[in-house]
A protein has these predicted regions:
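Specific alpha-helical transmembrane segments that line the substrate/conduction pathway
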Residues: 36-47, 87-120, 238-245
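Specific transmembrane alpha-helical segments of multi-pass solute transporters/efflux pumps
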Residues: 18, 54-97, 102, 138, ...
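Transmembrane alpha-helices of multi-pass small-molecule transport proteins
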Residues: 32-81, 108, 164-171, 187-205
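Glycine-/small-residue-enriched transmembrane alpha-helix faces in small-molecule transporters
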Residues: 1-39, 77, 85, 130, ...
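Hydrophobic transmembrane alpha-helices of multi-pass small-molecule transport proteins
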Residues: 49, 73, 121-143, 192-196
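Helix-helix packing/entry segments at the starts of transmembrane helices
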Residues: 10, 97-104, 172-194, 224-245
Length: 245
């Protein structure tokens, strides 16, 4: 299907709304905490993708999984870290702190690709990295002075998200340089599965109410499974046309 300009704009608005809903939903949870929040969201992501993938790519998708590719497993591990760290961070500190910390993702990606792939960075990128570092340092210093006991640990957990995302992008670039076309949507399924298995024992005994499970089910289906499927499909098309630094 070819998107018209108007439909493409509304699609972007929709997927942005889906991604931004996690902070709001987390603040409306009644009893679910920390690792249990992550477990239920990841669990419903797995269930959703088990339905979405065959509908989207056909039933043969399961026979095409690159189980022998190390990049597939590393990619799944990165998604697992991102899924787990994001929700745990939201339960530890303010949503704004988490999102600001995650905003360093593109700059971390630039640094990692420079170190491991040898990509050259223009002077403006180095300047942006320095300014971002100063800004984040100033933010951390001002927040620590307020005496919030969870701010530092919450921010450190949130920092795992852009780090894992940067490693993820570097893996994609590396796999492409070796002639492998890594499909990231099955990697999302693997990441959600790993996240569920990791957080399940840490979630016991379950405390989430039916209301909480319903909200986290919405996150798993719409914020992760649906949003990521759309975004990664767009990214795959865009990679054929341009390179992103």
């Amino acid at each position: 299907m070819r998107l018209t300009h108007g439909l493409a704009v509304w699609t972007m608005v929709g997927v942005t709304a889906l991604w931004s809903m996690a902070g709001v939903v987390t603040r409306h949870l009644e009893q679910a905490r920390s690792f249990e929040v992550t477990f239920w969201r990841s669990f419903f992501t797995v269930v959703s993708l088990l339905v979405i993938l065959p509908l989207w790519q056909g039933r043969s998708v399961w026979t095409r999984l690159p189980l022998r590719s190390r990049y597939f497993w590393f990619s799944g591990l990165c998604w697992s870290v991102m899924f787990t760290a994001f929700m745990v961070a939201l339960t530890l500190t303010a949503v704004a702190n988490v999102l600001i910390t995650m905003a360093v993702g593109p700059l971390l990606t630039a640094l990692i690709t420079r170190v491991f792939l040898g990509h050259r960075l223009p002077a403006r990128t180095w300047l942006a990295i320095v300014l971002a570092g100063i800004g984040i340092g100033w933010m951390y210093g001002s927040q620590l002075s307020l005496g919030d006991p969870n701010f530092l640990i919450g921010s450190m957990v949130a920092l795992c998200v852009p780090i894992a995302g940067s490693v993820q992008w570097t893996l994609v670039q590396k796999s492409q340089s070796e002639g492998q076309n890594l499909d990231l949507v099955p990697s999302v399924l693997l990441g959600a599965l790993l996240s569920s298995l990791l957080t399940l024992p840490l979630s016991m005994p379950f405390q989430a109410s039916v209301h909480d499970v319903g909200l986290l089910g919405v996150l798993g289906l719409f914020q992760l499974a649906t949003w990521l499927s759309i975004e990664l499909k767009k990214l795959k098309r865009k990679q054929r046309q341009c390179a992103i630094i």
